[in-house]
Amino acid sequence: VESPQIRVEQKGSYVWDPPIKDLARDLDKVRYRELSVDRPGTEALIQRADEVFGDLLPPRIQGSFWWTMGLTWEAAKLIGLEQLMMYMYDDPEGLHRVMEWVSGEHMHFIKWFETEGLLTRKDGAQSVGSGGLGCTDELPQPDWHEGGPARLIDIWGFAESQETTGISPAMFEEFIVPYQVPLMEEFGLNCYGCCEPLHQRLDPVLRYIPRLRRISGSPWVDQEIMKRKIGHDFIFSRKPNPTQICTMFNENQIRADVRQTLEIAGDGPLEI
């Protein structure tokens, strides 16, 4: 299903023209993605790379880390961001149907990768989540076979819900988390959060997300609340404000920002 973007000239902002305008009429028309893999093309690419630099750096097939099991990005593309918010009031049962469908579609997506043997390990120096490395001795599972494809339970999972930053923690707990949890159950370890200020909705994340290890601390998070709630039990994945180097460079301000994080969370698992 295509979700055309309607763009304006100012700052590159845009909105979607959602394909689903009427839930009762349109939702039953959408279907899961049809997935395929080009194995001959992949093998040809590997052979070409091996011919060029294989004596220096043997090429290998490595799957990328997908974005994201958060669901609300795709839900917003289907029904529109405003409607995603408004249906929580105007048509809660309809929104539950939307979220159930999107969750099921994502389950279809990840299970296909597993069935086709396309998953690869992410427990080394690979990027996982919204920032951080996958280094861990908890993955893969003890029954993983050396040299074989990874399973979902052998790799990191990741979810977030940046699009719903403006809703209440209660609505987040009702409409979002229950549809993320079945997906997160499939993975060996999990990361949660990206640029949303998670301190406002951290309780249901800690309560329901299984095997959680890494929690995002965005530039807009209250670090003291975050640290108090996660203690030493999870990695505090801190994202300093990028505008400090993108639009200006004030070394004192940058140092002060990092110093504040170290003072608040430096005594526990922390990555910046």
Residue ranges and their predicted role:
Residues 33-272:
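Active-site loop segments of alpha/beta catalytic cores
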Residues 7-50:
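A gly/proline- and charged-residue-enriched helix-loop-helix capping module
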